[in-house]
Swiss-Prot record:
PROSITE patterns: CLP_PROTEASE_HIS
Subunit structure: Fourteen ClpP subunits assemble into 2 heptameric rings which stack back to back to give a disk-like structure with a central cavity, resembling the structure of eukaryotic proteasomes.
Coiled-coil stretches: none
Predominant place of localization: cytoplasm
GO CC terms of this entry: cytoplasm; endopeptidase Clp complex
EC number per UniProt: 3.4.21.92
InterPro entries found in the cross-reference section: ClpP, ClpP/crotonase-like_dom_sf, ClpP/TepA, ClpP_His_AS
Classification of source organism: Bacteria, Bacillati, Bacillota, Bacilli, Bacillales
GO BP: protein quality control for misfolded or incompletely synthesized proteins
Record-linked NCBIfam families: clpP (TIGR00493), PRK00277.1 (NF001368), PRK12553.1 (NF009205)
Protein name: ATP-dependent Clp protease proteolytic subunit 1
Length: 193
């Protein structure tokens, strides 16, 4: 069962019922709580653009609990975060892995956070190929370029040398919230708002 909770709010005109995500959106909170796919990306991008149109000066809060997912869908979110004027604060609640971790570290500098029991994981992009040898070679080149680009981005956002990032992302590299802070993925581990 996938029930979405509702909240009831008193207004001048009477009671108003919201699904919880719409209510959080009023407070400029966007949640990624699943694998990142095209549908999730479209929803998150729409929310970011809406919040920018509402107020381009106020920060947006992106809460992340995601195992990652599609790189193209992830880049749609990441590019929109960079495109819009408001700072996007990021917060890992639970797990931010793969592209979830990339979104986490791409928040506004000084505004990237993790809750104390969060876990963060970085690794190289995953992919597969089938078909003729030429098609496999083209796909392999694309994945290797993507790997280089992602490692470069992690290095730039964290301040780590690219050689260390390349080494760490060869396999799944898990970190606690405090380890992610030391690595430069988040700026602080928070226990209170």
């Amino acid at each position: 069962m996938n029930a979405i909770p509702y909240v009831v709010e008193q207004t001048k005109l009477g009671e108003r019922s919201y699904d919880i995500y719409s209510r959080l959106l009023k407070d400029r909170i966007v949640i990624i709580g699943s694998e990142i796919n095209d549908q999730v990306a479209s929803s998150v991008v729409a929310q970011l653009l809406f919040l920018e149109a509402e107020d381009a000066e106020k920060d947006i809060f992106l809460y992340i609990n995601s195992p990652g997912g599609s790189t193209t869908a992830g880049f749609a979110i990441l590019d929109t975060m960079n495109l819009i004027k408001p700072d996007v604060q990021t917060l890992c609640m639970g797990f931010a892995a793969s592209f979830g971790a990339l979104l986490l570290l791409s928040g506004a500098k000084g505004k990237r956070f993790a809750l104390p029991n969060s876990e963060i994981m970085i690794h190289q992009p995953l992919g597969g190929a089938q078909g003729q040898a030429t098609e496999i070679e083209i796909t392999a080149k694309r994945i290797l370029k993507l790997k280089h680009d992602i490692n470069k981005m992690i290095a730039e956002k964290t301040g780590q040398p690219i050689e260390r990032v390349a080494h760490d992302t060869e396999r799944d590299y898990f970190m606690t919230a405090e380890e992610a802070k030391a690595y430069g993925i988040v700026d602080d581990v928070v226990t209170k708002k």
